[in-house]
Amino acid sequence: MDYKTSGVDIEAGREFVSEIKQAVEATHTSNVIEGIGGFGGLFRIPIDSFKKPVLVSGTDGVGTKLELAQSKNFHFEVGIDLVAMCMNDIITSGARPLFFLDYIATGKLDKKQLLRVVQGISHGCGENNCSLLGGETAEMPGFYSKNKYDLAGFCVGIVDEDKLINGKKVSENDLIIALKSNGVHSNGFSLVRKIIQNNNQIDKEFEKVSHLNFYDELLKPTKIYNNVINQMLSEDIEIKAMSHITGGGIPENLPRCIPSDFIPYINTSSWQIPTLFKFLKEKGSIPERDFWNTFNLGVGFCLIIDKQFKDAILSICKDYGIDSWEIGKIVRKNDSTISKFLPEILT
């Protein structure tokens, strides 16, 4: 018995690397010394642009969205999701992404499927001037089923230590600006999949309500906010804190980026929750608290700023085609008039 008979096709793996090479190398900046094919990717750190350069790293996956996306052939889109989940995390520190690495594990290498995944990863990187420096594709028969794959991503960025955004400058009455999400993004899909299992006509019912394709809306790739944030920082707009709204929703993620003696007060009437979320809530009979603590509800990213920068930020977001609005403000925890986060729903 040889290795191929056991389920691992070394030759197919070599062919796959050859097929993805063009997509990967299209993302390479002048700082890439050596990328795909070697034992390690080599990247020249652009330290001349920084007084005290700090590297910022992040790693993430796409979660159980992969299960649904694979069943509906949304392979390119989950590649973008992978980049977004990592990149949106590191930019909250004010970092500029430098390079990205991916890990793909599968039961049996399907070159056509996984080429689309890598093309999606390359697209996400290329749109944000981030080099796809390398990765690993592991064929693991018996561990993963034949037609399934899992993804993990790793993003590294750079920021000047003096320009780190860490929430320490947040103060009372600072404004919270919301940037609209692209949909469900990559969180809450264990619940979504359960709702779908219990409603076998859910796609047709959604189309009656919205006149939109259910799976096209549900599986839209996660929005990447890097370019619009970079534009703000390049115009010397002071952002005191940022939050990527992922698992746990606004209630879990927004407080993470501010000092413990403050709380974010959110005006829940400042935006309309998108139809898709309300539809899922109804079909799944989701309790209000779980609804807010599971989904982003149309808010993908939040900024905390001094009010003097509000108009400039809203204008830049408009230029980048991103809806944005003032969603709330920062208050002290001991403020007797506002004692709870999202008081309308969490009492």
Swiss-Prot record:
Catalysed reaction, written as an equation: 2-formamido-N(1)-(5-O-phospho-beta-D-ribosyl)acetamidine + ATP = 5-amino-1-(5-phospho-beta-D-ribosyl)imidazole + ADP + phosphate + H(+)
Entry superkingdom: Bacteria
Catalytic activity, EC: 6.3.3.1
SUPFAM superfamilies assigned to the protein according to its UniProt record, in alphabetical order: PurM C-terminal domain-like (SSF56042), PurM N-terminal domain-like (SSF55326)
Subcellular location: Cytoplasm
BP GO annotations: 'de novo' IMP biosynthetic process; adenine biosynthetic process
Pathways per UniProt: Purine metabolism; IMP biosynthesis via de novo pathway; 5-amino-1-(5-phospho-D-ribosyl)imidazole from N(2)-formyl-N(1)-(5-phospho-D-ribosyl)glycinamide: step 2/2
One Pfam match: AIRS_C
Principal location: cytoplasm
CDD domains: PurM
CC per GO annotation: cytosol
Enzyme class: ligase
The name this protein goes by in its record: Phosphoribosylformylglycinamidine cyclo-ligase
Name of the gene: purM
